[in-house]
């Protein structure tokens, strides 16, 4: 993220969920999912952010 968008930070919104905010099959209940965004909340970056996550092994 910092190499692609200088000054923009990765934000982890949620990882583990035990309060039932996600669907029954959600991996959040196993700690195997994460909701992320960028500090500028620019939705145009989300597709590339997803690609970066896959390249990083997520």
Curated annotation (Swiss-Prot):
Zn(2+) binds at residues 28, 35. Ca(2+) 2 binds at residues 14, 17, 19. The indian hedgehog protein N-product binds calcium and zinc ions; this stabilizes the protein fold and is essential for protein-protein interactions mediated by this domain. InterPro entries: Hedgehog (IPR001657), Hedgehog_sig/DD-Pept_Zn-bd_sf (IPR009045), Hedgehog_Signaling (IPR050387), Hedgehog_signalling_dom (IPR000320). GO terms for cellular component: extracellular space; plasma membrane. The gene is ihh. Keywords: Autocatalytic cleavage, Calcium, Cell membrane, Developmental protein, Hydrolase, Lipoprotein, Membrane, Metal-binding, Palmitate, Protease, Secreted, Zinc. The keyword Secreted applies. GO terms for biological process: cell fate specification; cell-cell signaling; proteolysis; regulation of gene expression; smoothened signaling pathway. It comes from Rasbora paviana. GO terms for molecular function: calcium ion binding; patched binding; peptidase activity. Ca(2+) 1 binds at residue 14. It is found in: Cell membrane; Secreted, Extracellular space. This is Indian hedgehog protein.
